[in-house]
């Protein structure tokens, strides 16, 4: 669940109320939620927001600060009991290791498309396990990346939850996670789970003809930018 709209370095405490109210509403219908700060919140407000959310017991808070701020994230993790999640902007075991050594993270979220594929994400998971840290791979992406993550999840003892893009709000037009495969039924969700794929390879069959057709005239995708109130570049 997205955390907040953009906040100033120091903002009115009332600017945090919407995030807290939305979490309360989700919990009221018997569901759990993690809260994604997207690294857009600065330390003065992140401390307040983490404390305000804590009584409502989110599953985790994600990227409460930019990943460059290892010591500040460690301090925040000592301030609240809520698990700290991060890792989509960390691209290797070497990027991950300082957070593990500092005790700054409880749930690592490596992205298989960023960190070098199946081999490296398995090494990251194994390294995290030695620090009693879970993994929840970042993947608001397509079927190939998700299928690869599912195969890793089936072998990682410290895997806890998998992000997926099915029905996500920024899918383009009529395209979704199920659009590019001959066997979209592998993504059927029942009770919050999908079945482990049994097909060859990653377990999905790509509709290559459809991919070629939809890619005609396509332009390179550029990550959107998110600007702060003073014109500063924020994380997306």
Feature map (PLM): residue ranges:
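Structural signal for hydrophobic packing residues in well-ordered secondary-structure cores
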Residues: 27-30, 57, 153-157, 215-218
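Shared catalytic-loop signature of beta/alpha-barrel
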Residues: 57, 68-85, 90-200
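Metal-dependent enolase-superfamily TIM-barrel catalytic cores that perform enediolate-based chemistry
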Residues: 1-79
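Extended hydrophobic packing segments that form well-structured cores
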Residues: 200-236
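Catalytic cores of large soluble enzymes that bind and process phosphate-bearing ligands
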Residues: 11-18, 116, 141, 202
């Amino acid at each position: 669940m997205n955390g907040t709209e953009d906040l100033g370095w120091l903002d009115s405490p009332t600017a945090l109320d919407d995030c807290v109210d939305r979490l309360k509403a989700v919990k009221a219908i018997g569901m759990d939620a993690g809260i994604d700060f997207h690294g857009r919140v600065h330390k003065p407000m992140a401390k307040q927001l983490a404390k305000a959310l804590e009584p409502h017991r989110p599953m985790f808070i994600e990227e409460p600060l930019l990943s460059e701020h290892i010591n500040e994230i460690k301090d925040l993790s000592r301030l609240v009991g809520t698990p700290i999640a991060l890792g989509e902007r960390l691209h290797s075991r070497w990027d991950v290791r300082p957070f593990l050594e500092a005790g700054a993270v409880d749930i690592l979220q490596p992205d298989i498309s960023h960190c070098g594929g199946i081999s490296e994400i398995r090494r990251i998971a194994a390294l995290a396990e030695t620090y009693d840290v879970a993994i929840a791979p970042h993947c608001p992406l397509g079927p190939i990346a998700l299928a690869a993550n599912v195969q890793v999840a089936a072998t990682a003892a410290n895997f806890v939850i998998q992000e997926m893009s099915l029905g996500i709000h920024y899918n383009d037009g009529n395209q979704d996670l199920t659009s590019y495969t001959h066997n979209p039924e592998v993504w059927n969700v029942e009770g919050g789970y999908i079945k482990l794929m049994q097909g060859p390879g990653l377990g999905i069959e790509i509709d290559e003809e459809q991919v070629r057709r939809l890619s005609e005239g396509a332009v390179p995708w550029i990550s959107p930018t998110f600007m702060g109130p003073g014109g500063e570049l924020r994380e997306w």
